[in-house]
């Protein structure tokens, strides 16, 4: 996509305005070349940029579609399931109860503790079944 750059005196000296052919404006930083912010929404025809007003809203699904797969998964799982490394690095007292699925969710394991009077260390726990020592 082609860009035309222009300087804007109202911006700080470390910023650069880039206008795309479709009319959108991006603000880029001279300090961090990876940083940019989209100021206007592009329109076909190359007319003047359509700036976002306070009344105009952006639908969340359009933003969701621009996210990477990793961010989508984090977005979907946020609040419903924790990342396994977060679960494992938390202190043991704050972890979720054990379950058959091993992730601290779905089927709690605590009701079955009474079946092992000698403790769970004497039983080998498999994800699909419990194997009692003979």
UniProtKB/Swiss-Prot annotation:
It holds the Pfam family DUF2647. It is found in: Plastid, Chloroplast. Keywords: Chloroplast, Plastid. One of its GO terms (cellular component) is chloroplast. Belongs to the ycf68 family. PANTHER family: ORF16-LACZ FUSION PROTEIN-RELATED (PTHR34890). This is Uncharacterized protein ycf68. It comes from Zea mays.
